[in-house]
Regions:
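Acidic, surface-exposed loops and disordered segments
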Residues: 2, 7-214
Length: 214
């Protein structure tokens, strides 16, 4: 996702302090093959310390220019959930009510302001300053990546999750981001799965249907 020039600058200073090896099947099962989208959760809390752990993992995921447009509101209290629920599609209300925490995965429309610190080897901020129309698409795209890293972080810590797009974005923005700087991307419920809220595994496309090697 980086430009070739940016990659050259960043790669010239890279040092990999550790060797890499394939993860075990047990880890791959937990992160991918056996992990499921969850629609109901057990009444088990997720601690604030665990929420900090989630962020401290997801923040290391790669993004363009090392930008960090993702912003996260961890909706945990009854009062905060009551503020969110009116913006939901009716069918999604029980999921939020049962989840230990619902994360509003949002993005910062002014994220390039931080790029001089986050990507000091190249003036990435100037790229966005010269092309303001690309700021919001980049923020949305990279916050989507960061939201996916949050899903993997939750799985890595033994938690379950379920992403949702059934909500009124304007209502969420009005309730939680009234100044307009941050905008919601999607919602993510996190907790411990109730087996009753796990649907049978649906099929995936075969490699030949979705991919090609050129």
């Amino acid at each position: 996702m980086l430009s070739m020039q940016a990659c050259a600058v960043s790669n010239s200073k890279k040092v990999f302090p550790m060797s890499h090896q394939a993860m075990s099947d047990a880890v791959l099962d937990q992160l991918f093959r056996q992990a499921r989208t969850v629609h109901a959760f057990k009444p088990e809390a997720v601690s604030d310390a665990t929420i900090h752990q989630l962020y401290d993992l997801l923040k290391w995921g790669p993004t363009a220019f090392n930008g960090q447009p993702g912003r996260y509101v961890f909706v945990k209290s009854a009062e905060a959930k009551a503020k969110l629920i009116p913006a939901l599609s009716p069918g999604n209300v029980p999921q939020v009510e049962s989840a230990a925490v619902t994360v509003i995965v949002a993005y910062d429309t002014r994220f390039p302001e931080h790029l001089p610190t986050q990507f000091p080897g190249y003036d990435a901020k100037a790229v966005f300053d010269a092309n303001p129309a690309i700021v919001e698409p980049a923020a949305f795209r990279n916050s989507s990546l960061q939201g996916a890293y949050l899903i993997l972080a939750a799985r890595a810590l033994g938690l379950d999750s379920g992403a949702m797009s059934g909500f009124n974005p304007q209502a969420v923005n009005d309730a939680f981001f009234p100044d307009g700087r941050f905008k919601v991307n999607f919602l993510l419920n996190i907790g411990v799965a109730d087996p009753a809220g796990v649907y049978p595994r649906a099929p995936r496309l075969a490699f030949e249907e979705a991919a090609q090697i050129l």
